Amino acid sequence: MHQVIQLKILDSRIGDTISLPAYATDGSAGLDLRVCISEPMQVAPQQTVLLPTGIAIYIADPKLAAVILPRSGLGHKNGIVLGNLVGLIDSDYQGELKISCWNRSQEHFTVNPGDRIAQLVFIPVVQASFEVVNEFTESSRGEGGFGSSGRY
């Protein structure tokens, strides 16, 4: 599936010294988002910072949304994850994409201009409505939760 999404460049470095979001490989699910800052920034242990990307997107289609996800290598190797765990971009949002970056490690981490810091994945959306009922049709699972379906 291919969908065209409007992208607005908010900082003149985008497309010049800082690359536009791009898929790293043909099989990549997420577009790499880069940090749009002027100089290196230190993120102290346990600190959370909001990093600009220099871009805004407008999805427009209410059957589509985007999620900002962490890059697995940053989290595993450096303890750098998203401060909000997952960022949800609604179809009608038009502001700058910003990355909430949390250094959960015990070491300082340097973010450099143009670093790939997160990834943007587009996902289909189903807007549900509710039917209020007094009872559910019984399922084999019932009300079991929090580990009830297996060892973990």
Swiss-Prot record:
Query: Which leading EC class covers this enzyme?
Result: hydrolase
A Pfam family of this chain: dUTPase
Catalysed reaction, written as an equation? dUTP + H2O = dUMP + diphosphate + H(+)
Residues the entry annotates as binding substrate: 71-73, 84, 88-90, 98
UniProt-recorded Gene Ontology molecular function terms = dUTP diphosphatase activity; magnesium ion binding
| Domain of life of the organism encoding this protein | Bacteria
Amino-acid biosynthesis found in the keyword field = no
- Tell me its cofactors: Mg(2+)
**Pathway listed for it?**
Pyrimidine metabolism; dUMP biosynthesis; dUMP from dCTP (dUTP route): step 2/2
Q: Name one GO biological process term.
A: dUTP catabolic process
E.C. number: 3.6.1.23
CDD domains linked to this entry: trimeric_dUTPase
- What keywords are annotated for this sequence in UniProt? Hydrolase, Magnesium, Metal-binding, Nucleotide metabolism
Q: Show the HAMAP family listed in the entry.
A: dUTPase_bact
> Which family is it part of?
Belongs to the dUTPase family.
Q: Which PANTHER family match?
A: DEOXYURIDINE 5'-TRIPHOSPHATE NUCLEOTIDOHYDROLASE
Task: Report the function annotation for this chain.
Answer: This enzyme is involved in nucleotide metabolism: it produces dUMP, the immediate precursor of thymidine nucleotides and it decreases the intracellular concentration of dUTP so that uracil cannot be incorporated into DNA.
How is this protein named in the record?
A: Deoxyuridine 5'-triphosphate nucleotidohydrolase
Organism per entry:
Legionella pneumophila (strain Lens)
